[in-house]
Amino acid sequence: GKINNIPFFCTCGVGFDAFVSLKFADSGKRGLLTYLENTLHESLTYQPETYEIENEEGTVKYKAFLIACGNASQYRNNAYITPHSSLANGLIDITIMEPFTVLDVPSLSFQLFNKTLDQNSRIKTMRAKKIKIHRQHDGVMHFDGDPLMAGKELEVEIIPAGLQVIASPEKRSK
């Protein structure tokens, strides 16, 4: 897929995950522990934003903690943010995580790693070939976890069969 004409393979998005990606990139240290430290620290002060999401069917408005767009289902470390994404269906799966309380964290965390996040009442989902995300302020977005500052308007689209793989004849599946 592409977000603002930048290619991504698995996921892209805006909101908390993009913000943490930026903090993680600036931290100078790598690894799961550093990522978790950044996540916990930033979750104490992060403020959800209001977004409009426009697709082929119309426009919806959400106050969201994050919006994740998935071509594939997994963030990393077996966390499934768009659990029903498929690399083969030509569609982007969109997960909108609405604001939540500390009491929601255990179930959200369990469902994130159990491929059932879409069953949580704080989660809204949709599928589309292309979406536009409108937000009130410039901010960070991410593509496969790499942060980048971007404007108020974001465009996400899928590139059907966009990944070409070269393999030797004996390695090809039949």
PLM features: residue spans?
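Glycine-rich phosphate/pyrophosphate-binding beta-alpha loops
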Residues: G13, D17, A68-P83, P147
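ATP/nucleoside-binding phosphotransfer catalytic cores, i.e., glycine-rich phosphate-binding loops
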Residues: N55-E57, K61, S86, I96-K174
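Catalytic core of DAGKc-family lipid kinases
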Residues: G1-F65
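Short acidic/glycine-rich loop or secondary-structure boundary segments that cap or lie
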Residues: D17-V20, K61-K63, Y75-N78, V102-V105
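Glycine-rich, charged/polar anion/phosphate-binding loops
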Residues: L36-L40, E49-E56, N77-T82, L117-Q119, ...
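Short beta-strand-to-turn element immediately C-terminal to the catalytic PLP-Schiff-base lysine
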Residues: I3, S21-K23, C69, M97, ...
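Gly/Ser/Thr-rich active-site loops/lids in small-molecule metabolic enzymes
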Residues: D26-T34, P83-L103
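A residue-level signal for conserved active-site and pocket-lining positions in enzyme catalytic cores
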Residues: G1, V20, I67, I94, ...
